[in-house]
Curated annotation (Swiss-Prot):
This is Vitellogenin-6. Precursor of the egg-yolk proteins that are sources of nutrients during embryonic development. May play a role in cholesterol uptake. May be involved in thermotolerance. PANTHER family: VITELLOGENIN 1-RELATED, VITELLOGENIN-RELATED. It comes from Caenorhabditis elegans. It is found in: Secreted. Synthesized in Caenorhabditis only by 32 cells building the intestine of adult hermaphroditic individuals; they are cotranslationally secreted into the body cavity and subsequently taken up by the gonad. The gene is vit-6. Residues 1-15 form the signal peptide. The lineage of its organism: Eukaryota, Metazoa, Ecdysozoa, Nematoda, Chromadorea.
Length: 1651
């Protein structure tokens, strides 16, 4: 036994001796300085780790050890050789901040002999005073080996003479002398500024030198950066800071500056990369190198002399990177041979990977490895030559199964484009041109991948141009468009300003100026020779994608050439977008004159401003924009400018913070209101959020540009951007729409529908079209007035829909007469849609099959490390997807005269596999190590759905989903951090799989949750892990979740049924519920009526409802089998003044009902009606939880006072405002189970906390002394009646009372109105979508009074009517010889303000006028007498009696409301820029309002006279039009004279409102005074006459007195008729109160409130 123990100890000792053979080397130092003819040996240890800079997190580590022999020859020449070099790797969880023993690593045992020989080759360098000058390597040495030797030499460089900039401080005798200085040196990592700090140790005769590299001050750095994000100046200061690099060397030196010896060196270096956010740590490459002197003495063995005249420098050699770049850009095989050949069997590797992919396709499942396989194929293809690609292509194209072969070919061509080398692109182009195995449409999609290629070049661009100009592109417009747009993007990658960093060598320019000029000339020539608008736009978008600085000059000519269409000029302005950071000043100089020129089209001006703001101009340009904004008359341009500036001022994007502050300063000096923006459609909006701490953010932009030429938006745009993979992706995605004159097509379609009806448009066979003949009066009117037709732009209707990605035009779709497919045109015959043609098209269905492989994005950074090996950080997202299926349509019933049903079936099998890879690896031909974080997702979601729709009697929609027949995995999500090592054998025939080790946190550092849950038809299983430490991010933790679908039924069916307007008989017991309604429980005082009166009014209301039409509306929703079932039933009368709605579900039952009081027709009826109560009652039961709610709506005293102020306004408008209910009292009784009660209490506490923080001065919460009845909430809401923008609210709960006073709302609050609303039967019978379009299109409003007209564009001017008809509004843009409508008005009595209004609409003539008997209406000569609730229904219009004094003509085009004196005209927005008459030009512009009958801008008198219809039946005073006071514009700030047009009857005249007595406030310097007795003051503050002074007694208090300031606010809100006793006592008790006599202004007469 002892023998075995002794043997074991001996073995351990021998092993220990073997393991530490380098660490136990004896040191023999015989020299004190470097001298010629001597030999020095150092032990070099290098350790390079890749992973997170957090202890005990995954690290992939490379370890290098070697003996370095240095021999000084003569002078300053040094020979160096590496001996006994060893290389090792490790995946262990180690702290890489210290040098680990070599024996803890796994050594590469059989290192390639070639590698050994390369590393042992000698090297010579000039070494003068510690600085390395010229280096000479062996001729056969390779770049990677040279760089390792440079790393060793780099550690010997120290500026021992201290020649350069010196900064030192003398120390005291007790301190060691130290000094520091800076110098610019060439180091392995670049030519940068370095800082030296020297500490001299006198006792030991040593010097400690510290050297650090300042990477912020480098003139040259050998790194590569391939990124797809645009340049962002501010982002470089925010997001780039976290990609830090630091290198520090510590030297131990003995001797003097002329004779020294380096005893030891330690280097620590770290390169940080932020894959997601700074908060969640960074990915780090940490280098630790040490060199320790172990021998200094006589030469043992002579190092061979290097016979190479070529010299190199110390900076990292990028020959390998240069060869890789040149191979990709040029395709010359000499560069391919210079690359490290890691395998000789590339073709066989790719064949096997495609075979594996074919099996996965055959199995019909998307696997996690599919995305990995795509990435590996791309990697190998990037190093394949033309011959190898042909072999691979033959293998892919010759698969036995044609369906699988089709998908493989599609993936292969995608990978060719993803590889992005010139050789792969040439094969792609050749195959597309030969039309072999790739359809042009698929080629047009695949070629888009080249937009973000890694190594673009002019040679590759010319290859793409060859495809663009080929016959196959000419035959397929989609391919031609994709080709040219991609060509521009590739040119931009080579010649434009991008964040890419390429390898530069020997001053070779990738894009010389003459090459750029040729490209610009080529594209400009293409633009000039284009015969169609589409071709011109394509050329401009290609120029935009190219982003060449030389394109500015031809683009400027196009923009300023007014002979070009507006669309072309706008596209030329958009073509500046890629130059906004490269040439901002030039863009501003070109576009600022365009924006400032008011003669330019509005669309061009707004587009120019948009691009100017994108350049983030300096203050000088912004001040010009602000000055233009102050005087801008074009309302659309002004609104767009304001909204654009406001959006940038409030922006949080890190790319625009500096600019945002400048814009905010500009807006602070420009007064504007949000209403100026909201009133107009042209608007620009931004919504952004950004967290600097988390380095995450998102921004959404939206813009709509409207002009006076069109009712449709001229341009609309929406875009998104944000942080992705640690970079702010500006202009990430954008979609837009631009159009010109498309309203022509829409208007024709709407006109056909209005004239013929939809049932005559969609027919089975052709029908004869009807005719239209104008009336004799209309013909005479047009002939005498000679009204010139308003013509829109002569350009034919056209539009473009475009998509942009990363600020590049990705695709655009032209829409015009030529682009409409022939199949659609054949369906339209004689202006009608033939159902038979529709059925034939739909019967064909849509069959689709597609497979795609793509990198959603790819970012690569390669940085050299001080160990001589580069590290590469890659962030990419390889994705593979496929889909096969079909869509079929059927109309029901088949072959019928019409159709009332539709059947749609969708069958598809989409499959997606995607992997987000964050990888940091050490690039070395011996062995690769690294760390990567994999986030993978797989989706397999088969779809088999059928939708059936029927609308014959009621709307029924059935959706049937057929489930899979067996259990299927539909989703899988996995997160996996791994460290890996890879050793490549050149003769390997399969892709070298790395040895991976998944990192798992220890149990005490993570919370694990196992998932094994089953839901109906769904099973979820997997493991979720969450770190316990905030330093460890979630995205590096291993997790896995799988979702399985388990069918237990064959299909699901969802049914939605809608049945409206069913006749219903009112039940008598409905009124019983309302009679129980008790007002005594409400919070406020008792109402003005008692309970008996309440019951009486309810009885009357329901008696009236018994004679009304009552309808039942039912909506049902159900999912079978028994998942959800819901039914909603509403019983309402025709005008919805009574409605009872019931909701029935499985556990939910709810009822809500309301009833309006009697609805008055006139103000007089409203005044006589005492009962004005709206009663709402509701009840809800859900399980054991119940809620009862009662709401009482009525009018407050403030509302009634407001009604008195507007009683002289036009009657119908008065009724609208007077009938509003502004006070709502609510009682809620509830019974909750414990858990819902807890939720309710929690949410109510959150609401109270919000009120305390948001409204601290206007809210208070009072605890009740005696808690009231439990489970009851009472509330009162009072809405301010004038603007309805503020509310007072009191909420009483059982324990407390919450009071809110004058809370401002962001919008005008709608309130209930109890006035009579006439029914429009013709309108009610329209389809829902037609109702919405009808309502939305009625935008313009013109008010015509006796002496004042407020036009459609809100321009007020004075006007005088005569006994002759004047044209108020007319369709002046109709393409037919006769207009669709004309509205005329004349004065019929000289002494009275009575008017006559005539409406000519089609073949009909409607005349309305005032007489002694009242309002008269004639339709085509037949008199219509007034009858309450009467309505004249015609096919195209209605005539409605609102009340005995007001009549309304209603049609789809125009609506006229007339009360005998005043008229209000509503006009459809489709007539914008096509209306003429006294109601103005109607183009949303106030400066172009007065266009006369000949379509010329004129003075107001001549404008009014041009629309006067003179005949033998009328005479007028010609002098009237010569008096300027009769026709003049009324400005907002101009005081208006008394208007006689507000009279309705002969005896009614404007009466001055008498001032009332109230307490007045006198503000004086440093004090506030209140009158002791009331004085006369106007209610609305508007005095009509000059005020008089009166001497009165006042109470005065200091202005600092809070009580006085509060009283002042209250009195101004609610005037006091006299002082209440309690307030008077408080006033007299105030400190420093004084009584004195002063003069106070007293009002004599007041202006009425002009509604």
């Amino acid at each position: 036994m002892k023998f075995f123990i002794a043997l074991a100890l001996l073995g351990a000792a021998l092993a220990s001796t073997h393991l530490d053979r380098y660490n136990s080397i004896e040191r023999n130092i015989q020299e004190s300085s470097f001298r010629a003819g001597r030999e020095y040996r150092y032990l070099f240890n290098g350790q390079l780790s890749a992973g997170l800079p957090v202890p005990s997190t995954p690290q992939g580590i490379s370890r290098l050890q070697s003996q370095v022999t240095l021999q000084w020859t003569d002078g300053n020449t040094v020979r160096m050789q590496l001996q006994k070099t060893r290389f090792a790797t490790s995946q262990q969880e180690s702290n890489s901040m210290k040098m680990l023993p070599f024996e803890r690593f796994e050594e590469v045992e059989r290192m390639n002999r070639e590698h050994q020989e390369l590393l042992s080759m000698p090297v010579e360098f000039d070494y003068e005073h510690g600085l390395v000058r010229e280096i000479r390597f062996a001729e056969n040495d390779q770049p990677w080996s040279e760089n390792i030797k440079r790393a060793v030499i780099n550690m010997l460089q120290v500026n021992i003479l201290k020649k350069e900039k010196y900064e030192g401080a003398e120390k005291s005798d007790n301190q060691e002398p130290t000094f520091s200085f800076t110098n610019v040196e060439r180091t392995l990592e670049g030519e940068c500024e370095v800082l030296y700090t020297v500490e001299e140790i006198k006792k030991e005769d040593e010097q400690r030198w510290a050297k650090s590299i300042n990477f912020d001050k480098c003139t040259r750095r050998p790194y590569i950066h391939h990124v797809q994000t645009p340049v962002c100046k501010d982002c470089q200061q925010t997001l780039e800071q976290d990609k830090m690099s630091s290198t520090v060397l510590n030297y131990n030196i003995t001797g003097t500056s002329s004779s020294f010896l380096i005893n030891s060196v330690e280097l620590r270096s770290q390169h940080l990369f932020a894959p997601i956010s700074e908060k969640h740590q960074l990915v780090s490459a940490f280098t630790l190198n040490t060199m320790e002197l172990i021998y200094a003495g006589e030469k043992k063995t002579e190092i061979k002399q290097v016979r190479n005249e070529k010299t190199s420098e110390l900076v990292y050699n990028q020959e390998s990177e240069w060869a890789e770049q040149q191979w990709a850009q040029t395709g010359e095989e000499k560069y391919l041979r210079q690359l490290p050949q890691w395998t000789e069997n590339k073709v066989e590797m790719i064949k096997k990977m495609f075979s594996l992919m074919a099996k996965q396709i055959e199995q019909g499942e998307a696997e996690l490895e599919a995305a990995h396989t795509v990435a590996r194929i791309v990697k190998v293809l990037r190093e394949c030559n033309e011959e190898q690609l042909e072999q691979i292509y033959r293998h892919v194209a010759e698969h036995k199964d044609e369906k699988i072969a089709e998908q493989l070919r599609s993936i292969y061509f995608n990978t060719l484009a993803l590889a992005g080398t010139r050789v792969t692109i040439q094969q792609f182009v050749d195959k597309v041109q030969s039309r072999k195995n790739i359809a042009p449409l698929k080629a047009s999609v695949a070629i888009k991948t080249l937009v973000d290629m890694r190594y673009p070049s002019l040679a590759i661009a010319e290859d793409i141009a060859r495809l663009c100009e080929s016959d196959v592109s000419s035959s397929f417009p989609a391919l031609r468009q994709s080709c040219w747009l991609t060509y521009g993007a590739i040119v931009n990658g080579v010649c434009g300003q991008t964040p890419r960093v390429f390898v530069q060598k020997n001053g070779v320019k990738m894009c010389p100026r003459d090459a750029k000029q040729r490209i610009v000339d080529k594209l400009v020539q293409q633009f000039e020779s284009a015969s169609t608008r589409y071709e011109k736009v394509l050329a401009l978008k290609t120029l935009a994608n190219a982003g060449l600085d030389l394109s500015v000059y031809p683009l400027e000519k196009i923009i300023l050439n007014e002979q070009h269409e507006t669309t072309i000029r706008t596209q030329a302005i958009e073509s500046f977008r890629r130059l906004r950071t490269q040439m901002p000043t030039k863009i501003q100089r070109v576009l600022m004159p365009v924006y400032l020129n008011r003669q330019q089209p509005q669309h061009i001006r707004m587009s120019a401003l948009h691009q100017i703001i994108y350049t983030q101009p300096e203050w000088s340009v912004l001040s010009q924009i602000g000055n233009q904004l102050r005087q801008e008359r074009n309302q659309q341009v002004r609104a767009f400018t304001l909204s654009l500036l406001r959006s940038y001022a409030n922006n949080e994007s890190p790319c625009e913070q500096t600019f945002s502050s400048r814009v905010q300063s500009l807006l602070n000096n420009i007064p504007f209101s949000s209403q100026e923006i909201d009133r107009f459609e042209s608007v620009y909006g931004k919504w952004s959020t950004y967290s600097r701490r988390h380095q995450s953010g998102f921004e959404a932009n939206f813009a709509s540009l409207f002009t006076t030429e069109s009712v449709l938006p001229t341009e609309m745009m929406a875009s998104i951007e944000g942080v992705l993979s640690g970079e702010w992706n500006q202009y990430f995605a954008q979609i837009g729409f631009t159009q010109k004159n498309m309203e022509k097509i829409i208007k024709k379609l709407l006109s056909n529908v209005q004239e013929k009806g939809l049932e005559q448009i969609v027919v089975r066979g052709k029908r004869a079209s009807g005719s239209f003949q104008p009336t004799e009066f209309l013909s005479n009117l047009l002939e005498k007035l000679r009204i010139t037709r308003r013509q829109s732009s002569e350009q034919d209707p056209h539009a473009f829909v475009y998509i942009r990605h990363r600020d590049m035009d990705y695709a655009f779709l032209p829409i015009d007469a030529d682009s409409i497919p022939e199949v659609v045109r054949s369906m339209i015959q004689g202006g009608r849609l033939e159902i038979g043609d529709i059925e034939r098209v739909l019967a064909q269905g849509i069959h689709f099959s597609a497979s795609n492989a793509a990198f959603l994005y790819e970012t690569v950074r390669r940085v050299p490390t001080p160990m001589g090996l580069p590290v590469q950080f890659t962030s990419k997202m390889p994705t593979i997807s496929s889909i096969r299926g079909q869509v079929t349509f059927e109309l029901e019933p088949k072959n019928g005269k019409s159709f009332d049903g539709l059947r749609l079936r969708v069958q598809a099998g989409p499959r997606v596999a995607s992997t987000h890879v964050l990888s940091l690896r050490v690039i070395c031909p011996i062995a690769e190590v690294g760390t990567k974080f994999l986030h993978q997702a797989v989706l397999n979601t088969p779809v088999d759905t059928e939708i059936r729709m029927n609308w014959e009697d009621k709307v029924v929609i059935r959706a049937i989903y057929n489930t899979p027949s067996e259990e299927k995995r539909i989703a899988m999500i996995q997160s996996r951090p791994v460290t890996f090592t890879r050793t490549v054998a050149p003769d390997a025939r399969q892709y070298p799989e790395p040895i991976e080790m998944t990192y798992m946190l220890p149990a005490h550092k993570q919370l694990s949750q196992s998932l094994d849950r089953e839901y109906p038809q769904i099973r979820v299983q997997g493991t979720l892990n969450r770190p316990t430490s905030v330093r460890i991010p979630q995205w590096i933790v291993d997790s896995n979740v799988e979702v399985y679908y388990k069918p237990n039924v064959e299909q699901y069916e969802a049914i939605f049924e809608l049945n409206l307007y069913n006749n219903y008989k009112m039940e008598k017991n409905y009124e019983k519920v309302y009679k129980k309604h008790n007002g005594r429980r409400y919070l406020e005082a008792e109402p003005e009526y008692d309970e008996e009166e309440h019951r009486e009014q309810i009885t009357k209301k329901f008696e009236w409802l018994q004679n009304e039409k009552v309808y039942q509306h039912v909506a049902k929703f159900e999912i079978k089998p028994e998942v959800v079932k819901m039914e909603v039933e509403a019983v309402c009368n025709n005008d919805f003044h009574f409605c009872k709605t019931q909701i029935r579900g499985e556990e939910l039952k709810a009822t809500i009902q309301y009833v309006y009081p009697q609805t008055p027709r006139t103000v007089e009826e409203l005044k006589e009606q005492k009962y004005r109560q709206l009663v709402v009652m509701g009840e809800m039961n859900y399980g054991e939880n119940t809620i009862h709610i009662n709401i009482n709506g009525q009018q407050s005293q403030e509302q009634k006072k407001f009604v008195k102020q507007i009683e002289q306004a036009p009657e119908h408008e008065t009724l609208l405002e007077a009938s509003r209910l502004d006070q709502y009292q609510t009682v809620v009784e509830y019974e909750f189970e414990p858990k819902p009660a807890q939720y309710f209490a929690r949410y109510w506490n959150m609401v109270q906390a919000y009120l305390r923080t948001q409204y601290p001065w206007t809210s208070r919460i009072e605890t009740r002394e005696e808690p009231s009845r439990k489970n009851m909430i009472r509330a009162t809401i009072n809405v301010e009646p004038r603007q309805r923008l503020t509310v007072n609210m009191t909420i009483e709960t059982p324990m407390e009372t919450t009071v809110l006073e004058r809370v401002e709302l962001p919008f005008r609050l709608p309130t209930a109105q109890i006035h009579y609303q006439p029914r429009n039967s013709r309108y009610e019978q329209k389809p829902v979508m037609e109702k919405i379009a009808h309502h939305a299109s009625k935008q313009a409003n013109c008010v015509v009074k006796s002496t004042k007209i407020n036009t459609f564009d809100q321009v007020a001017y004075r006007n005088q009517f005569t006994p002759c008809y004047s044209v108020l509004a007319k369709d002046c843009g109709s393409e037919k010889s006769e207009p669709r409508f004309v509205v005329l008005m004349k004065k019929i009595n000289e002494k009275k303000e009575w008017k006559n209004v005539k409406v000519v609409y089609g073949e009909n003539e409607i005349e309305m006028y005032k007489t002694e008997e009242g309002l008269i209406c004639r339709v085509n000569g037949e008199e219509i007498e007034y009858q309450p609730e009467s309505e004249i229904e015609k096919k195209q219009y209605n005539i409605i009696w609102l009340n005995k004094n007001t009549l309304k003509f209603d049609s789809d085009d125009v609506t006229v409301q007339f009360d005998g004196v005043n008229a209000r005209i509503h006009l459809s927005a489709l007539y914008r820029n096509q209306q003429c008459g006294l109601c103005g030009h109607y183009d949303n512009e106030k400066e172009t309002e007065f266009y006369d009958a000949e379509n010329q801008e004129n003075t107001i008198p001549k404008f009014a006279k041009s629309y006067l219809y003179k005949d033998s039946k009328c005479n007028y005073e010609r002098e009237m039009f010569e008096k300027e006071e009769n026709f003049q514009r009324i400005e907002k700030n101009q005081e208006e004279e008394k208007d006689q047009e507000m009279n309705y009857e002969e005896s009614r005249r404007e009466q001055d409102d008498e001032p009332t007595e109230q307490v007045a406030i006198v503000e004086r310097q440093h004090e506030i005074c209140f009158t002791q007795k009331p004085v006369l003051r106007c209610q609305n503050g508007k005095s009509q006459e000059s005020k008089k002074q009166k001497v009165t007694s006042v109470y005065c208090l200091p202005s600092s007195n809070s009580w006085a300031r509060r009283q002042m606010r209250e009195i101004r809100r609610e005037p006091l008729a006299q002082w209440p006793e309690h307030k008077l006592r408080n006033l007299r008790d105030q400190p420093q109160m004084e009584e004195r006599t002063v003069r106070v202004a007293v009002d004599q007469k007041c202006d009425k409130f002009d509604y």
